[in-house]
């Protein structure tokens, strides 16, 4: 347990940030899942639309420090490659 006032405040702050980051991470996963479901169904139009929605969400998470920027870029790249090979 935190003893000093500043440590107690830090604990509160971390709890708030954790909740926010958890929400953002969940949101990213939802968008990525929608792209993967569209790819699995074989619907290229839906997959492209889902990717277009997921890409800014992934990059926003990287900007906010939820994901590393290279991780976000890698995820976008791999999803884009899979969408591109659909009906190729």
Swiss-Prot record:
One of its GO terms (cellular component) is cytosol. It comes from the Bacteria. The keyword rRNA-binding applies. Keywords: Ribonucleoprotein, Ribosomal protein, RNA-binding, rRNA-binding. Transmembrane segments: none annotated. InterPro entries: Ribosomal_bS20 (IPR002583), Ribosomal_bS20_sf (IPR036510). GO terms for molecular function: small ribosomal subunit rRNA binding; structural constituent of ribosome. SUPFAM superfamilies: Ribosomal protein S20 (SSF46992). GO terms for biological process: translation. Pfam families: Ribosomal_S20p. Belongs to the bacterial ribosomal protein bS20 family. Binds directly to 16S ribosomal RNA. NCBIfam families: S20. This is Small ribosomal subunit protein bS20. It comes from Chelativorans sp. (strain BNC1). The gene is rpsT.
């Amino acid at each position: 347990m935190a003893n000093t006032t500043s440590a107690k405040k830090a604990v509160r702050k971390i709890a708030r940030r954790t909740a926010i980051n958890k929400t953002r991470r969940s949101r990213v996963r939802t968008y990525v899942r929608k792209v993967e479901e569209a790819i699995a169904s074989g619907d290229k139009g839906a997959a492209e639309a889902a990717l277009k929605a997921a890409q800014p969400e992934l990059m926003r998470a990287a900007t906010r420090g939820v994901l590393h920027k290279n991780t976000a870029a890698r995820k976008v790249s791999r999803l884009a490659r899979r969408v591109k090979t659909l009906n190729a």
